[in-house]
């Protein structure tokens, strides 16, 4: 699927790996100028090189999204330099795997800082640009663990659930200004984060894969396509939704025997 994002400007956090990198590359291939943000410099530079080699327009910024002042300043700077901000994808994530009795308050706060509070920061800053311009689309990346319980992921699950409801509220506040906000809700996707989970909890990961109705995990390209759709004019009458992209897992009532 080819999307027409020519002339548009997009900010993607967590944009140098997995779902974020695939989204960055897809938007650039479709004509957008992509502002790729992540913490790790090496992966940022690799992403920049790949996009430029394919003829895309890209900037990279080393950013910890939990630094609210830095994130808000970046959004304002991008909008000022480019004269617009059309799209935002909040994909940066933090996860701690532990039983609740072993989870520390620092772990809890870190996951909320990245998965929920940073989405608030980025969305608020983007709204200040998009609402007066009467154009814009924001996609926030949640998780099926936000709507289905997963052991040992309490802080991650709770923060991703908060993200879904925040997105819906922000969508209602922005709808009259022609600014749309939606979530994608990935299931098991072949990313570094899920591979890390599989190493730490192999039995749970194996059972999760077996229980997917489509009998396979997803790949980052499939998530990037869903994100691009929600960002695009093809979704111009869609706002406030949480779109599962999970092979049917969240729709399933009973696990297979």
What positions do the PLM features span?
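Residue(s) in the substrate-gating loop at a strand-loop-helix junction
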Residues: 143
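Alpha-helical segment proximal to the catalytic Tyr-Lys
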Residues: 128, 172-176, 236
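Short, small/polar-rich loop/turn modules that mediate ligand/substrate recognition or access, typified
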Residues: 89, 175, 180, 238-240
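Substrate-binding pocket helix/loop in short-chain dehydrogenase/reductase
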Residues: 99-100, 107-112, 208
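Active-site helix of classical SDR
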Residues: 123, 159, 167
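Short C-terminal tail/terminal secondary-structure segment
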Residues: 1-2, 148, 228, 239-257
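Conserved glycine-rich cofactor-binding loop
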Residues: 9, 16-17
């Amino acid at each position: 699927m080819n999307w027409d994002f020519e002339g548009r400007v997009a900010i993607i956090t967590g944009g140098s790996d997995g779902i974020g990198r695939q989204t960055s590359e897809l938007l650039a291939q479709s004509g957008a100028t992509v502002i790729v943000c992540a913490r790790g410099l090496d992966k940022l530079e690799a992403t920049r090189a790949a996009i430029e080699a394919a003829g895309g327009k890209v900037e990279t910024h080393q950013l910890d999204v939990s630094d609210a002042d830095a994130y808000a300043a970046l959004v304002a700077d991008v909008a000022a330099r480019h004269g617009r901000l059309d799209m935002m994808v909040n994909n940066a994530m933090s996860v701690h795997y532990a039983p609740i009795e072993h989870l520390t308050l620092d772990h809890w706060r870190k996951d909320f800082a990245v998965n929920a509070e940073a989405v608030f920061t980025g969305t608020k800053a983007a709204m200040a640009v998009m609402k007066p311009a009467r154009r814009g689309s924001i996609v926030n990346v949640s998780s099926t663990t936000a709507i289905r319980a997963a052991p040992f992921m309490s802080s991650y699950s709770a923060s991703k659930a908060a993200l879904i409801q925040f997105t819906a509220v922000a969508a209602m506040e922005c709808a009259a200004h022609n600014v749309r906000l939606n979530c994608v809700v990935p299931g098991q996707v072949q990313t570094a984060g899920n591979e890390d989970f599989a190493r730490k909890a192999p039995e749970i990961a194996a059972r999760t894969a077996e229980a997917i109705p489509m009998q396979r995990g997803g790949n980052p390209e499939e998530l990037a396509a869903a994100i691009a759709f929600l960002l695009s004019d093809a979704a111009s009458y869609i706002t406030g939704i949480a779109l599962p992209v999970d092979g049917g897992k969240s729709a399933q009532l009973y696990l297979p025997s």
